[in-house]
Amino acid sequence: MRQLVFRSLAALVCLGVLSLSQSSAATKPNQPDKPNLSGAWVLDLQASTSLDPLMTQIGAGFLDRKYAAHTKLKATLQQTADVLTIAARGPGFTFNQTLYLDGRTDPSSKQLLGATALKTRTAWSEDQKHLVEKHHIRTRQGKEGQLTIKRSLIEQGKAVEAVMILKLDEEPTPTSARQIWRKQV
């Protein structure tokens, strides 16, 4: 049971943490138009919307959903031109992930909010302002669909908004949630 809670938290981290920006939203010389996501960040639970509807649709259990709703996470991100490495921590859990930012499709078996990501593609938006991560997922009930995470700098680079949209193949209406990550001081 505890492992399920940790997997759900890992999904929470994957969804929001990846969006974090460096303290000043500076760019690296080899990425003149892209935000630098490197830095230390803290999830602002008060400013974020509930992940409960999204996690419920995926099939996450009650305890997983409640644990994710009340756990304050911290994350450290390290970005290069092609890779974003995430190390997230919370009470009793650790999550590490590497995202390839060049648009390639990466086969995966990561647990995201109770679903399994079958493959992941991460790339910058056309305007180079948003990091867009698309996961082809399978829920615990065997349904397939797409979980899209769009991250944008807000508050002059002092926070990142991560908007998550879940669209299951067999369901007409998408479900969404939003996380706000604040620069750690």
What are these regions (language model features)?
Residues 26-185:
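Hydrophobic small-molecule pocket/channel-lining residues, especially in calycin-type beta-barrels
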Residues 1-10:
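Bacterial N-terminal signal peptides that target proteins for export
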Residues 10-18:
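Hydrophobic helical h-region of N-terminal Sec-dependent signal peptides
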Residues 20-25:
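Sec/Tat signal peptide C-region and signal peptidase I cleavage site
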